[in-house]
UniProtKB/Swiss-Prot annotation:
CDD domains membership: RNA_pol_B_RPB2
Function: DNA-dependent RNA polymerase catalyzes the transcription of DNA into RNA using the four ribonucleoside triphosphates as substrates.
HAMAP family on file: RNApol_bact_RpoB
Transferase recorded as keyword: yes
Protein's UniProt keywords contain Repeat: no
Classification via InterPro entries: DNA-dir_RNA_pol_bsu_ext_1_sf (IPR042107), DNA-dir_RNA_pol_bsu_external_1 (IPR019462), DNA-dir_RNA_pol_su2 (IPR015712), DNA-dir_RNAP_su2_dom (IPR007120), DNA-dir_RNAP_su2_hyb_sf (IPR037033), RNA_pol_bsu_bac (IPR010243), RNA_pol_bsu_CS (IPR007121), RNA_pol_bsu_protrusion (IPR007644)
UniProt gene name: rpoB
Family to which the UniProt record says this protein belongs: Belongs to the RNA polymerase beta chain family.
Acidic residues bias (residue ranges): 1194-1212
EC number: 2.7.7.6
UniProt GO cellular component terms: DNA-directed RNA polymerase complex
Alphabetized NCBIfam families for the sequence: PRK00405.1 (NF001616), rpoB (TIGR02013)
Region (Disordered) location: 1193-1212
Protein name: DNA-directed RNA polymerase subunit beta
Length: 1236
């Protein structure tokens, strides 16, 4: 039943029936943990991979010993970095040892290796002053994958791919004649036996003895024309290196570098783990019948007798006893199953090895050698440490290759299973740490090359580590990754939810991932393994659908990068759920039967029903309670945070829920946020983890509170913590970040308590919109097609008013003609235009500005022009050289307005770091209050979006029996066809709750049922059907039928009409066609397309049409004359020929068509072509002011280009005597044979 729950400072009445057994993990730990791992272990791994660097003779050895991030010497704090456009980073110091083997001399030095970007507490990076997020990438895990295709006769042809993290691929395929082929590194096919021979099994008999008598393998041997190991090696060499003379030695070294060299071939830890899991004996021989006795190689005891069935547990023992291969009997055929010979170390040694930290399986032959040669614990541990790279090889080994071939052979007989590439057990996450590690590795390997070169060139006696190291390649690799990688994204900072979702995003795109064009339907589709790991709902609509996903609420990422989800363990004996929680990866979960979280249980966790609904893979089954393995921890475990914030999600259609999840991320923070009356209970957790709320670092007592800072006296040592609040700062999306304290003086706070609200939060809960009194009623057609009718009250009371802050900057540079200057003294500007500009030439804070107003006065020197005689005379008399400058002030762009809230000035003199050539930089921040207006987009949380069609006076809105008018009218027809009934239930429950004075939590899939809502309605004193008689505000008459009225939570989205509306009279024109540019950003015009032309033709509006196609578009002369005529008030002249017509003629002439333009009298009309001088003669500048002009990419900014040419021309001495007739006119053929 409904019960109170304390959420932060607010009490909500919760309808949830499932008690959460486990805490939801920190929502941004996918970012924080990954980066922390990188600093702790990831960097070590890279340095270990590259160690040691030796020169070609081997007498100089350079080693990276240790590293540290120098946290004391961080240049600026996070806030300062944002202000100064700096990168938040710490210097990386590496201690390096250089050893000279000839002299035995050792030099150690600490070398600075560049600034390394640091992650903020919120899981973001500040790069050049902008907050960025590194999105995690979903990629295929390295490992071995088996698949099959079906040929024309319906036979299954098995194929397989061995995918390393980096290195050559191995692909096996079968043709319809049952011959198995292999491709090495995407080259031509070879028979599989050639590969096996090259790995050391020379003759046919050896091959058959090793792999067992198998028909397809025999067929492959017959197809193969090599008979010995050497021939096989040469054959492979010919395929891989065609055109080079094949020798056995070069073939052996080629195969070694391709597969067995850790620098060239890397399986990575994940790859090794997947390999061992797939190729181990236990899963392959379980439940099969043994064809021979299986003997333990160490003790000689018989583990399974011939003809016995091998159970799962025994299979596990066989695997860990180091048995290399097992013969099983299938339909009277003996099939040999070969493993890759890896065993569990714990089962092989008698003592405790937990201090070695080895979790993986180890290579049995290597281990056996160690155990045979050593007996005491200490030396065995020492040897294991020494040989760790052999015990757990990072590259592939011969045993792996034999096992993959054996697996391929066994598939035909049902031994083993094929893989599903879209299964989350085969896809893994590359998070920040790993992406950074890969980038750092690239930088280091480039540096390694430089170091080797320098070792050879420089004097070996005087050499020091510092001289060898060049940090440029490393710094460049890191910078490139943060600056331009597809996965390093500008943080979506519209509201706290959008920040949080951005950090939890999973992308299948990016380097090493898929591309939009190639991704098929299967990759994008929802898969059963997504359950509890990836949200099935939240994904963009459009070309990226299904490629960009969101992490589910309870999901975690394990050390291998696989996504895990928690389940409660069921005690099968007693049929009760324990409180033990375990995290499972997708392939571990596949064996289990999982009950849902809502399954009724008594207080001891015993199932109430005898039969239970469970999920197994993609099936839902009903089984007795004794068969249940696991139970979901929570009902919201399958969805992401944004989706979990939609109440009554279970009553919505999935595609509308998708829109609801996506639109919540676009909600603009309002002036006074309001938490939803009908919430889901996750709002508090989401706000706290998003990082927008200041939290108390230590427990204590609040001693001082103001709008901009909070002081807390610590309990531990009596010191004071000071928390500065952000006031009216601009976010990445141009919304306003403002924090307000929610604690009082004298209040006791505990550690990590929220002490202030941020943007879009209310008492520490996410509050994206407002609770609005609304009704489902049509009103005079203003609800047509999802439009919304709103009351003037929402405008007057600033219910949906939001703050937007735009940033404009102006820099004074050095030009070739002298420095630009920021000043109040601007030529040809009236005093009125400078009324708010101070004596520095910068606008004052608090001034109200409109488009075209000067923000920063700036003048740029102009080139000296030729003076006329009169001017020279005046100059001579008055002796002053007129300052030749032009006005290049920063003005408010077209269509913008607001109030100046902040000015920042950076100058060289103050020691600020500026770009080269910049002397001064001024930033202005303009804030606007945007009230809700017609054309703004609003939405509910259920995908019910619409545009405001009319703002009606309050007195005309339909009103309730108690006289209160509605605030919004929505169209009732928007509900049934879209099947998002959740909004109706929300309205009912909100109506009851607002009268009872409750805030409600109705968790997704575990929320209020219809009887419970009805009960609340009756408790609040309403009709059961929740309908009300409404009265028409214009006449006072009641409407014919009762109407559903209630409280709906409505958001104002970021698509505001003020940003979309746009007008142009004249402005920039395209270079070739001379037509106006398009789009608001380019200050372009509206395209009058073919359909619009048809409309005018149908009207017969010939003159309008002619005007649109000529003077309003690309008749260059005509448009200038028209402009003049309008200014002077004369009649508009006849249009000329449009430029695009001339372009068309030129294109036809380029096709060798002789085209002439004739007039009515059939006389040729010459089309004049314009050169720049003619353009200059068209005096009027109708391209708009210089600020609005879009710079053409080819045109240089300054005039230096033209001037240089003039000087060159002046220096040429013309030789008068040359006669043009004497010059050679014939082309000699030699001219063509010139090298150029």
């Amino acid at each position: 039943m409904v019960h109170p729950v304390q959420v932060g400072k607010r009490t909500r009445m919760s309808f949830g029936k499932v008690n959460d057994v486990t805490e939801m993990p920190n929502l941004i730990e996918v970012q924080l943990d990954s980066y922390e791992w990188f600093l702790r272990e990831g960097l070590h791994e890279v340095f270990d991979d590259i160690n040691p660097i030796t020169n070609f003779t081997g007498n100089l050895v350079l080693e990276f010993v240790d590293y540290k991030l120098d946290m004391e010497n961080i240049k600026y704090s996070v806030e300062e970095c944002k202000e100064r456009d700096a990168t938040y980073a710490a210097p990386l110091k590496v201690s390096i040892r250089l050893q000279n083997n000839e002299t035995g001399e050792i030099k150690e030095q600490e070398v600075f290796m560049g600034d390394f970007p640091l992650m903020t507490e919120q899981g973001t990076f500040v790069i050049n002053g902008a907050e960025r997020v590194i999105v995690s990438q979903l990629v295929r895990s390295p490992g071995v994958y088996y698949n099959y295709s079906i040929d024309k006769s319906g036979k299954k042809l098995y194929s397989s791919t061995v995918i390393p993290n980096r290195g050559a691929w191995l692909e096996y395929e079968t043709d319809s004649n049952d011959v198995i082929y292999v491709r090495i590194d995407k080259t031509r096919k070879l028979s599989i036996s050639i590969l096996a021979r090259a790995m050391g099994l020379g003759s046919d008999q050896e091959l058959l003895d090793f792999f067992g008598e198998e028909e397809r393998f025999r067929a492959s041997i017959e197809k193969d024309n090599t008979k010995t190991k050497e021939e096989a090696l040469l054959e492979i060499y010919k395929r891989l290196r065609p055109g080079e003379p094949p020798t056995v030695d070069s073939a052996i070294s080629l195969i070694d570098t391709l597969f067995f060299d850790a620098k060239r071939y890397d399986l990575s830890r994940v790859g090794r783990y997947k390999f061992n899991k797939k190729l181990a004996l236990n899963l392959r021989i379980a439940n099969q019948v043994a064809a021979t006795d299986i003997v333990n190689p160490q003790t000689g005891e018989i583990m399974v007798e011939k003809g016995q069935k091998i159970s799962r547990l025994v299979a596990e023992e066989i695997q860990n006893a180091g048995v290399k291969s097992v013969d099983v009997l299938i339909e009277d055929k003996v099939i040999r199953v070969i493993s890759n010979n890896f065993v569990d170390l714990k089962k092989q040694v008698s003592f405790d090895i937990s201090d070695l930290g080895i979790k993986e399986l180890v290579h049995y032959p290597t281990l056996k050698e160690i155990l045979d040669n050593f007996s005491d614990e200490a030396s065995i541990k020492e040897e294991i440490k020494k040989n760790i790279s052999k015990l757990i090889p990072k590259h592939i080994i011969r045993d792996d290759i034999f096992a993959t071939i054996s697996y391929e052979l066994g598939l035909t007989y049902g031994i083993g299973y094929v893989d599903d590439i879209d299964h989350l057990g085969n896809r893994r996450l590359r998070s920040v740490g790993e992406l950074l590690q890969n980038q750092f590795r690239i930088g280091l390997s480039r540096m390694e090359r430089v170091v080797k070169e320098r070792m050879t060139i420089q004097d070996q006696e005087a050499i020091t580590p510092q001289m060898l190291i060049n940090i440029r390649p490393v710094a460049a690799a890191i910078k490139e990754f943060f600056g331009s990688s597809q996965l390093s994204q500008f943080m979506d900072q519209t509201n706290p939810l959008s920040e949080l979702t951005h950090k939890r995003r999973l992308s299948a795109l990016g380097p090493g991932g898929l591309s939009r064009e190639r991704a098929g339907f299967e990759v994008r589709d929802v898969h059963h393994s997504h359950y509890g790991r990836m949200c099935p709902i939240e994904t963009p609509e459009g070309p990226n659908i299904g490629l960009i996903n969101s992490l589910a609420t309870f999901a975690k990422v394990n050390e291998y990068g696989f996504i895990e989800t928690p389940y409660r363990i069921v005690d099968k004996e007693n049929g009760r759920a324990t409180d033990e929680i375990r995290y499972f990866t997708a392939d571990e979960e596949d064996q289990c039967l999982i009950a849902e979280a809502k399954e009724p249980m008594d207080e001891n966790g015993h199932f109430i029903n005898k039969k239970v609904r469970v999920r197994h893979l993609e099936d839902i089954l009903v089984v007795p309670t004794t068969d249940v393995d696991l139970i979901d921890v929570s009902a919201r475990q399958i969805v992401s945070v944004a989706t979990a914030m939609i109440p009554f999600l279970e009553n919505d259609d999935a595609s509308r829920a998708l829109m609801g999840s996506n639109m919540q991320r676009q909600a603009v923070p309002l002036l006074s946020p309001q938490a939803p009356i009908v919430g889901t209970g996750i709002e508090f957790k989401a706000a706290v983890d998003s990082g927008v709320l200041p939290k108390a670092k230590n427990a204590g007592v609040v001693t001082y509170v103001s709008g901009s800072e909070i002081r807390v006296k610590r309990d531990s040592d009596g010191g004071t913590d000071v928390y500065k609040l952000l006031k009216f700062k601009r976010s990445n999306s141009g919304t306003c970040i403002n924090q307000r304290p929610i604690v009082d003086t004298g209040e006791i706070v505990y550690k990590n308590q929220v002490i202030a609200d941020g943007p879009s939060t209310d008492l520490g809960e996410i509050a994206l919109g407002k609770n609005i009194r609304m009704g489902f009623i049509t009103w005079e057609g203003y609800n047509y097609e999802d439009a919304m009718l709103i009351s003037e009250e929402l405008v007057r009371e600033d219910v949906f008013t939001s703050m937007h802050i735009e940033e404009y900057e102006c820099e004074a540079r050095d030009t070739k003609l002298g420095p630009e200057e920021i000043t109040r003294d601007i030529p040809n500007v009236s005093d009125d235009a400078l009324k708010d500009v101070d004596d520095r030439g910068i606008i004052r804070i608090g001034a109200e500005v409109r488009s075209g107003d000067i923000l920063v006065g700036k003048v740029t020197p102009k080139g000296e022009t030729e003076l006329t005689a009169e001017e020279r005379l005046l100059r001579a008399i008055f002796g002053e050289k007129a300052r030749e400058v032009r006005d290049t002030s920063l003005r408010v762009p077209h269509g913008e307005a607001g109030i100046i809230v902040d000015i920042k000035v950076f100058t060289r003199e103050n020691g600020d770091e500026l770009n080269p050539g910049v002397n001064e930089l001024v930033r202005c921040y303009i804030a606007q209050k945007r009230k809700i207006s017609v054309g703004d987009k609003m939405a509910g949380r259920h995908g019910n979006k619409g545009v405001i069609s009319r703002i009606l006076p309050e007195e005309d809105m339909p009103f309730l029996p108690d006289g209160r008018p509605l605030q919004i009218c929505l169209n009732p027809l928007g509900v049934p066809s879209r099947m998002n009934i959740g909004q109706v239930l929300e309205v009912h429950l909100g109506w009851a709750a607002s009268h009872l004075g409750w805030h409600i939590a109705t968790p997704v899939f575990d929320g209020a049922t219809q009887p419970e809502i009805t009960e609340c309605m009756i408790k609040a004193g309403f009709r059961e059907d929740a309908k009300t008689i409404l009265y028409d505000g214009r006449t006072g008459e009641p409407f014919d039928n009762p109407v559903t009225v209630g409280i709906m939570y409505i958001l104002k989205l970021h698509h505001l009409v003020d940003d979309k509306i746009h007008a142009r009279s004249t402005g920039p024109y395209s270079l070739v066609t001379q037509q106006p540019l398009g789009g608001k950003a380019q200050f372009g015009g509206q395209r009058f397309g073919e359909m619009e032309v048809w409309a005018l033709e149908a009207y017969g509006a010939a003159h309008t049409l002619q005007e649109i196609l000529t003077v309003k578009s690309d008749d260059v002369v005509g448009r200038v004359k028209t402009y003049e005529a309008i200014v002077k008030g004369e009649n508009i002249p006849e249009p000329g020929v449009p430029e695009s017509f001339k372009v068309l003629i030129k294109e036809l002439q380029a096709l060798c068509l002789d085209i002439k333009v004739l007039n009515d009298e059939h006389e040729e009309v010459t089309l004049k072509e314009f050169v720049d001088e003619d353009m200059a003669n068209l005096e009027v500048n109708i391209e708009g002011t210089e600020e609005i002009m879009v710079p053409e990419p080819d045109v240089l900014d300054d005039d230096s280009y033209d001037q240089n040419n003039d000087e060159d021309i002046d220096e040429i001495d013309y030789d008068e005597s040359v006669d043009i007739a004497d010059l050679e006119t014939e082309l000699e053929l030699d001219d063509f044979n010139d090298e150029h």
